[in-house]
UniProtKB/Swiss-Prot annotation:
Predominant location category: membrane
GN (gene name): lepA
Domain tr-type G: 9-190
UniProt cross-references to SUPFAM superfamilies, sorted A to Z: EF-G C-terminal domain-like, P-loop containing nucleoside triphosphate hydrolases
Protein's name according to its UniProt entry: Elongation factor 4
Native source species: Helicobacter hepaticus (strain ATCC 51449 / 3B1)
Localization of this protein: Cell inner membrane
Keywords tagged on the record: Cell inner membrane, Cell membrane, GTP-binding, Hydrolase, Membrane, Nucleotide-binding, Protein biosynthesis
Database matches in InterPro entries: EF-4, EFG_III/V, EFG_V-like, EFTu-like_2, G_TR_CS, LepA_C_sf, LepA_CTD, LepA_IV
Family: Belongs to the TRAFAC class translation factor GTPase superfamily. Classic translation factor GTPase family. LepA subfamily.
Amino acid sequence: MKALIVPQEYIRNFSIIAHIDHGKSTLADRLIQECGAVSEREMTAQIMDTMDIEKERGITIKAQSVRLNYPYKGQTYTLNLIDTPGHVDFSYEVSRSLSSCEGALLVVDASQGVEAQTIANVYIAMENNLEILPVINKIDLPAADPLRVAEDIESTIGLDCTDVLQVSAKSGEGIKNLLERIIECIPAPSGDENAPTKALIYDSWFDNYLGALALVRLVNGTLRVGQEVQVMSSGKKYEVLALYYPHPVQKILTQTIGCGEIGIISLGLKSVTEMAVGDTITDSKNPTKVPVEGFRPAKPFVFAGIYPIETDKFEELREALHKLKLNDSALSFEPETSVALGFGFRVGFLGLLHMEVVKERLEREFSLNLIATAPTVVYEVYMTDGSKVLVQNPSELPEVQKIESIYEPYVRASIITPSEYVGNIITLLSNRRGVQEKMEYLNQSRVMLTYALPSNEIVMDFYDKLKSCTKGYASFDYEPIEYRQGDLVRLDIRVAGEIVDALSIIVDKSKSYEKGRALVESMKEIVPRQLFEVAIQASVGNKVIARENIKSMGKNVTAKCYGGDITRKRKLLEKQKEGKKRMKAIGKVELPQEAFLAILKIDG
């Protein structure tokens, strides 16, 4: 299929902003169906969510794009829809999607109202000066209250909702009005088609047949097949081998991509790293002077060790991580070794959901069995000699006498909750060393709390605890703010006298005793009994702060003695005692995988 260049005034680039589960992917399905982009036979639910794991969890992870045509008032308009993820971990996918649009649909569930993540994404859209159209979805639900939600949007975000769009993505009600409103309200792109080529790469992935592909937004000029282009960050030059328009089922081949359009470019590269997200592509003979601005690359926020259970699968794990990295620019990893777990990788993630998704994809797509250690954040450690060390792995924390001070990263957390759960949340946040910044009532029944919290306190099980203390009604979003000095220590776990490096965690000094106590108690339940007594200890430095003993398994060595002399039995029992002593001195204890997960389960 060939496509013609569309004049800029007939192009609309927009994305959909919504909290998880507010019906964003279903709305995208209805828009695609209404525009006739996909035949009835090809249409599947959540057609934009291509990964199995996205469909199973009902979440969008990778931002997808699609080009739609819609006739309106005698003209055919091209609508480029960019679907964005709604979960807090994937907000970098949102920021890069929004940097290539002129408008955004703000989709809010008619029965639930505005959530914390929605507000965070609206602010990103406002920073990019986008036209925001509020849309109230799921109006067919029995609990729908569109008027309350419209007031909610006005009071929380400040958007005018007098003529707000009400739709049902499930039944298709209101979809035609929505498409017409997109054409009328969202501005056309404002690029200069005669200026030098300037294209922003806002996504890239690896195709087994075509190599590395990049999704670009043409800011100025045009792109055509055979043109020699230059990647601005590296200065390297390539020939454009093929150009496509995005389509949910099959890419549409084209010879040129016009100004203001979105398209897929193939330069015949073997690796995505040469087409980094956020980079600018320009013409090599007549380059643009300034690259496209307004894009922030993703920084890893949480680190964890990932190790193969079968130690000979290390190279396969390396290969698998490299393949995932091709499609996930936020993933970072480097090799590391652990005394307890052997060879593995220290992997950087955007958050806990990202970590879960990556681990699940590694296990599912590459058939690997993995152990993940407890997630940690990056600490700044200032040494007595004046130097500064960044610590990602607790076992790398220098000795106490060499440390001047430790700084830990803080986040600003926004939590929106029904007002009856405020007390529970305040208790949870104060237990997690949170500092209240503000608390505001959005309406009679909903409250927004803003807290500064150490990142360390939210990477374990904060989200689960928040959901359980609010019966699942609270929503949560965070952004990194700064490093602050903390009174922190490393808590080590010793099994049979040896430190298990993969179980070390960095904790606030005031909490070290209760965390150590909880850890040794849960480890006692998990570690299998041995033929000798095993001590499980929690220690800070050289000081043991908690201890539990696992009793040895008893073997009846006197079973073969039938009556007779007591000294014979005594001799056998003494011999057994000696053997156990020797075993205790040299015996190794195999730790089951649950032992490494015990850290995640202890209460903060």
